[in-house]
Regions:
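Active-site-adjacent structural elements that line small-molecule/cofactor binding pockets in enzymes
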Residues: 1-145
């Protein structure tokens, strides 16, 4: 912990289950992972075990997610966006389709709800179509609901 008080919150980012999550249990205020919902639940369960082992209240630690977010109206629109990204980045299309928050609006919003139910309190969204797409407009709808 930093010497100054109040100290800034300490984020421990990484999902290493033996070392990193143990450090998070001991010292962290927030943990941050890039995993699907099942992985988020798994990391949370392991973190909870580490918290019990070090005598820390698991609920004191904020669990957060960082990932790419790409939203489209329908599958055809999504395919077009992924094709454009793949061409621009030279990253295979499969990479994008495997990300948990890349899909249609309904798919992505449902997955975000699943993360919330799993205890995620904060999302750091990397928005690859920020300049030419409309994902950010879809995300703004989340704040209105």
């Amino acid at each position: 912990k930093p010497i100054q008080k109040p100290y800034p919150p300490l984020w421990v980012c990484g999902g290493g289950e033996k070392v990193t999550l143990k450090l998070l249990a001991k010292y962290g205020d927030y943990g941050n992972w890039d995993v699907d919902v099942d992985g988020f639940i798994q990391k949370s369960n392991i973190l909870q075990n580490h918290c019990e082992n070090v005598g820390r209240d698991f609920n004191e630690i904020g669990k957060t997610l960082h990932t790419n977010v790409l939203i489209a109206d329908n599958q055809n629109d999504l395919d077009r966006k992924v094709e454009k990204l793949s061409t621009y980045t030279n990253i295979p299309k499969d990479y994008y389709y495997e990300r948990p928050l890349i899909g249609t609006k309904d798919q992505v919003f449902e997955t975000i709800d699943q993360y919330k139910e799993a205890g995620c309190i904060y999302l750091i969204a990397y928005i690859p179509d920020i300049v030419w797409g409309d994902t950010v407009n879809y995300l703004s709808e989340l704040n209105q609901s």
